[in-house]
Amino acid sequence: MKCGYIRDTWDCGETLEVEEKHTGRYGARGQKREPKKEPTPEDIIRQNQWKRVRDLRRLVKWNFTTGDSWITLTYQKDKRVSWEEMIKHMQKFIRKLQTRYRKYGWTLKYIWRPQIGKRGAIHIHILLNAESNTETRTEKIVRELWIHGNPNMKVVYDLKNGDLAEYIATPLRNVAPR
């Protein structure tokens, strides 16, 4: 370990993350510190995005495993909704999903993120812990509860490299004001 660094180690299940950062007490003896530089707005945006991806990557690694569901909830073409309506639909969907999970004695874990497609259509990505028993499974429950369009479901095979967290944390563009 180099002098002037702090090492944090994060146990994320199958992976171990090591983060090294400056202590803030660096510089040679007898030399004055350089004047502090104000970060530019671009630096702040870049730093905030890096922290968002880092925290989301750890959250995904701690709470989800291989075999969980990556679901895209879409709206029917003739029934496009506003941003506010989409938020209400999603809150209602999550409430119903929690009720159904509790009914079977399961714990619901999810991360959801709205997105606007290339042609302006709103859709929602949701990472969901997959559960099943002899009666039902997560995919069947989602198909029953999402009545606004077609849920597209995929199985998550790799959570180690953080690509999924990076995709979820991508900043929204051209979003209607809240």
Label each PLM-derived region with a short phrase:
Residues 5, 10, 22, 26, ...:
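Sequence-level detector for tyrosine residue identity
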Residues 107-109, 116-122, 128-178:
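Conserved His + Asp/Glu catalytic blocks
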Residues 8-28, 61-64, 69-72, 130, ...:
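N-terminal nicking endonuclease/strand-transfer module with a His-rich metal-binding environment
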Residues 36-37, 79-80, 131-137:
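Intrinsically disordered, low-complexity Ser/Thr/Pro/Gly-rich regulatory segments
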Residues 1-58:
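DNA replication initiation on ssDNA origins
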